């Protein structure tokens, strides 16, 4: 019995020592941050060039696919109208696509200057003319 107790105590002490020596987390595991998370949110879009520059709110929301987002109300087209954008770090690309059901199409790009400002250029084609828009997005 004494031999069993000594064996048990030794085993417990070794276990405590081994598990107490596990490396501590330093909070810097270099795990990749989902690059589109900084884009998601409500933004004020201030058009500075184009046919009729305007200021309005857009929503950038998560989309299916690793680096895709949906942009609601681009070109003040309504929050039910969405343009799909591809995020690559600080760059946003809007491939040519229909914008709503009124025969408009949109394409363009943007660059995130910092976590609260995006500089954008996009083109909206209504079938008869193209509006070349320059805009600044500011995160709300």
Regions found by a protein language model. Give the residues of each.
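Extended lipid/amphipathic-ligand handling interfaces
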Residues: 82-87, 107-113, 135-139
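N-terminal glycine/threonine-rich, aromatic-flanked beta-hairpin/loop signature
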Residues: 51-89
């Amino acid at each position: 019995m004494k031999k069993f107790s000594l064996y048990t105590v030794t085993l417990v002490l070794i276990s405590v020592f081994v598990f107490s020596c596990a490396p501590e987390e330093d909070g810097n595991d270099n795990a990749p941050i989902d690059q589109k998370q900084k884009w998601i949110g409500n933004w004020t879009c201030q058009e500075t060039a184009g046919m009729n520059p305007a200021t309005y709110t857009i929503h950038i929301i998560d989309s299916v696919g690793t680096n895709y987002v949906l942009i609601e109300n681009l070109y003040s087209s309504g929050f039910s109208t969405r343009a799909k954008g591809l995020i690559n770090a600080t760059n946003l690309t809007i491939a040519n696509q229909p914008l709503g059901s009124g025969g408009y199409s949109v394409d363009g790009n943007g660059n995130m200057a910092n976590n609260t400002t995006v500089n954008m250029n996009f083109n909206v084609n209504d079938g008869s003319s193209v509006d070349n828009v320059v805009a600044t997005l500011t995160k709300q």
